Amino acid sequence: MQKSQMIFSKYSPLMAVDTPLIGSDGETMTTPRVCSLCRCGASSAKPYCDGTHSQIGFVGERDDSAKTELEYYRGRDLTIVYDRYLCMGAGHCGELEAVFGTHDAPRYEPDAAPVDAIVATIKKCPSGALSYLIQDEPRTHYYGTPRLVVEQDGPLHCRGAITLIDDQDSDQLLPKGDHFTLCRCGGSKKKPLCDGSHASLGFKG
């Protein structure tokens, strides 16, 4: 049975193994079993690597101290779990302001909306920063077939059972679920994970 993997080092592109690639237009792209994807942000062939990372001296290393701390917000029927480090500012949680507040004034009120509405909002969180418990049981797996989804001018969304292997032990930072986001712009301080820097940098691709 083929196992989907993302394998790379601080100095290499993202190497996707046995993982379908979905373009920003929603169409499945034709790729070999091992596909080299840009993460320096400078390739002229995005989402693919064209070797530019070696020319510009790209180093895909985290710039800050990686620290995962889970915050639990318990309600009557559901517990919201938040991993602040993984948040990349997608903003979907703000669609349910009664529960999650706004970007400038976040809050976590697990009893402020129906459970179904909260769960639906949490499932929109691409980074895995938000998850939930029901009767203290984690609910973190939402996707089936592994796949990579390219966001236009944004990160690479990894969905399904994809194993991440790199030289920074980044897998230890990931949630126990089946989705996370990887930086494509080269500017994240949490590399290889996305921190939302693509927006402020005006990344295109």
Regions picked out by a protein language model, each given a short descriptive name:
Residues 169, 178-180, 192, 201:
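Boundary-flanking segments of nucleic-acid-binding domains in nuclear regulatory proteins
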Residues 53-70, 103-115, 138-146, 198-205:
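Short cysteine/histidine-rich metal-coordination sites, predominantly Zn2+-binding motifs
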Residues 14-16, 35-38, 48-49, 130, ...:
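Short, structured motif recognition centered on aromatic/hydrophobic residues
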Residues 26-39, 70-89, 101-120, 135-141, ...:
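Ferredoxin-like iron-sulfur electron-transfer modules
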Residues 1-45, 50-56, 61, 76-96, ...:
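Ordered, small/hydrophobic-rich secondary-structure cores
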Residues 46-57, 91-106, 122-136, 191-201:
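Iron-sulfur cluster-binding cysteine motifs and their immediate structural context
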Residues 5-13, 17-18, 67-94, 112-135, ...:
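Short Fe-S-cluster ligation motifs
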Residues 39-43, 185-188, 197:
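A short acidic Gly-Thr/Ser loop motif
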